[in-house]
Amino acid sequence: MAAYVVAQVHGVNDPAGFAEYRSRVTATLHAHGGKFLVRDGATRVLEGDWRPVLVILEFGDADQANEWYDSAAYQGLSELRRQSAVMELILVEGV
């Protein structure tokens, strides 16, 4: 069953650091069967007060997603992400 990592980007406090993170993260995804479904897509708020930028990653299953997140390659980048942006990430399984 497909699994998704959903990230909400609430703010970027180091644009250069975040740009470096973004330029390097895709390679870490491919090694674990992951891909971007939503990244910087155009949005239209239908209801409520939506502020964060949304990113959605797709993996073949939750094991692949966890292996990506826990991988040395991604964990090496995650510190850069935490230093350069305010984000939340969740893992959710599809139907």
Regions found by a protein language model. Give the residues of each.
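C-terminal structural segments of small proteins and small subunits
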Residues: 62-90
